[in-house]
UniProtKB/Swiss-Prot annotation:
It holds the Pfam family PS_Dcarbxylase. Signal peptide: none annotated. It comes from Shewanella sp. (strain ANA-3). It is an enzyme of class 4 (lyase). This is Phosphatidylserine decarboxylase proenzyme. The gene is psd. The active site is at residues 89, 146, 252.
Length: 292
């Protein structure tokens, strides 16, 4: 059965399917939208008591529901200066060192940090010998992405690609999954060195958005696009620890890359398959400089 599921992913028109779902999710269909939201809540056992708007009728579109805000204070941010926090609600897929430009995906599978970053060689060099963490967001999860530490945006790259599912089954069977799928790479400058936040697209992910540029995808294309940003002055984009940096419309994956000597140890309980909650301790920092 697993082989059949994987084979179907290779055969399906994934981009066409994802864009169709995106149009449906953006539509405001009144009672039909509310019915779809109620079904989704029941199907995935979503705790709406955490949402700022707990009633399904409050959402005009499925996208509004899917990118719902949480109640203030429901995800308190760990403010300790030696702590990096979880950027999302989800589950840890993998984490560990970046060795010889290789990142571990699943048993028998690695992929290249250079490919992940859109073949930006200078960016890849900055993370050699550092660490990575991959976090999977299931459909039930809160889908806004937040900063694990304070950082100033220096670069963003859109990388075209496939739209395979990014669930654990696919990660075990599709080589180079996260470096094959469409993705948006944001590089931040922090007091601990560079931080890469890679927002990976997936089947039926209608769009990837950032707080500074809005919707990045769709539209899509076959060309890599890069934007550079000032890191000083009035136009610099600096986001605090715990501040929102982007969002997915339907579930996907975030891959984070950290510079060498940024992380001392991952926090207790942070390991593959561990559930993550945005704002909780994710890693202990080697550099004692303020990270918030």
């Amino acid at each position: 059965m697993d082989k059949v599921k994987i084979a179907l992913q290779y055969m399906l028109p994934k981009h066409l399917l994802s864009r169709l779902v995106g149009k449906l999710a953006a539509s405001e269909a009144g009672a039909l939208t509310t019915a779809a939201i109620k079904w989704f809540i029941k199907q995935y056992k979503i705790d709406m008591s955490e949402a700022a708007q707990s009633e399904p009728e409050a959402y005009k579109s499925f996208n509004d529901f899917f990118t719902r805000a949480l109640k203030p204070g429901i995800r308190p941010i760990n403010t300790a200066t030696n702590i990096m926090v979880h950027p999302v609600d989800g589950a840890v897929s993998q984490l560990g060192p970046i060795k010889d430009g290789r990142i571990f995906q699943a048993k028998g599978h690695h992929y290249s940090s250079l490919t992940l970053l859109g073949d930006q060689a200078e960016d890849a060099k900055r993370f050699e010998g550092g660490d990575f963490a991959t976090i999977y967001l299931a459909p039930k999860d809160y889908h806004r992405i937040h900063m694990p530490i304070k950082g100033t945006l220096s670069k963003m790259t859109y990388v075209p690609g496939e739209l395979f599912s990014v669930n654990p089954l696919t990660a075990r069977h599709v080589p180079g999954l996260f470096a094959r799928n469409e993705r948006v790479v944001a590089i931040f400058e922090t007091e601990l060195g560079p931080l890469a936040m890679v927002l990976v697209g997936a089947t039926i992910v209608a769009s990837i958005e950032t707080v500074w540029a809005g919707t990045i995808t769709p539209p899509t294309g076959k060309q890599v696009f890069t934007w550079e940003y000032p890191t000083v002055g009035p136009d610099a984009i600096t986001l605090d620890k715990g501040e929102e940096m982007g969002r997915f419309k339907l579930g996907s994956t975030v891959v984070m890359l950290f510079a060498k000597d940024a992380i001392d140890t991952f926090a207790e309980g942070v390991e593959p398959e561990a559930v993550t909650r945005m704002g909780q301790a994710f890693a202990n920092l080697k550099n004692q400089a303020s990270a918030d």
